[in-house]
Amino acid sequence: MLVAVLLIAGSGAVPSAVAAGAYEAASASTTVTYCSDGGQAQTLDMYEPLGGAALHPLLLVVHGGYWSVGDSAVSQQSQFTQAVMSGAVAAGFAVASINYRLAPANRWPAQIIDTRCAVRYLRATATRWHIDPHEFAALGDSAGGQLVSLDALSAQREQQWDSAQYAGQSTALQAVVDCWGIVDLTAPGWSRLGRGLSTNAFRVPLGSPSAVLRSASPVSHVGPGAPPFLIIHGLSDTLVPPRQSTELRTLLRAAGDAATLVEVANAGHGLATTAVPMVPALSDLAGQTVSWLLATLR
């Protein structure tokens, strides 16, 4: 049952920081089409907290997979993302996890077009989902981190990435959780695997001096007025170099924007761990993330 999966998957329990929340269960509406750019219907899974009359803040979840693989299903998310999703619903958030067009069948910028269209769809249908259109947060990991960060930093600019659907709605986000995101696509130091996978979407490998990669890099769009960022990265990540997150934090702060970086010891890509426990522990980090979202939006 989807309700049970959302509430217990990953960490085995709602993170302690939000265990006492007013919302103890969720209803799930699956296979909801949000956009159909390029003639391809894209769906999202919406999880709504039960109880309470107030409008809910929204957490948009965008999966990773080097723009080529992945799925909106809870079971396909990292253990950390699953824990944040369950904690967010327990804390009163509506959570929307999206699919988007994947490479190589769909080249860039299909992925950012779909992500931005999802934000606009959710604002257009805010009444249906009982969500506050002024309290939109997004969490993405790896390529998903690139997508949510790029949307947040380009906001109403870069209209070439806008679908014709829901054209009157804003793509703005009020908070971003960037988890080990790919934020500087032109930087050196990528693994052979990463360079190879990226060609599926961009036709050129990461690290190339390409105008397309530069435009797709969130760091190219940093400026004053960005929403608050919580950036999380495992220090043992060999697929996305941790300095990607350090660079983003530095640039955001230099522009006068709020940015917090959490560097997780003994954790690789996706916060994968070995025999040595990660620090902070996953359940603690998930609870802290939900608390940050609450403090930032409320």
Regions found by a protein language model. Give the residues of each.
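N-terminal cap/lid segment of alpha/beta-hydrolase-fold proteins
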Residues: G21-A54
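Short substrate-entry loop that stabilizes the transition state in hydrolases
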Residues: G52-H56, G65-R107
